[in-house]
Amino acid sequence: MLGWTLMFLVVAIIAGLFGFTGIAGAAAGIAKIIFFLFIVLLVISLLVNAIKGRAPRP
C-alpha cells in the first residue's frame, strides 16, 4: 500500500510541475487536489505501518 501511495505521489508531483509551470494550465487545479490527496494518503499509510510495528516492504 505504501508503494502505491508513493508512486501516485510522484505522479501527482510531476502533474503539479506541469500545471504550475503553465504547460498544462487547465490541469493545475486537478494536480493540486491530487497532490494533497496523496500527501494525506502517504501520512495515513505511514501511521498505519508505525502502529502495526512492521517495517515497510522493500
UniProtKB/Swiss-Prot annotation:
Family: Belongs to the UPF0391 family.
Subcellular location: Cell membrane
Transmembrane segments: 6-26, 28-48
Membrane association type: Multi-pass membrane protein
Keyword match Transmembrane: yes
Name the record gives this protein: UPF0391 membrane protein Sputw3181_2781
A GO-annotated cellular component: plasma membrane
Record key words, sorted: Cell membrane, Membrane, Transmembrane, Transmembrane helix
Alphabetized InterPro entries for the sequence: DUF1328
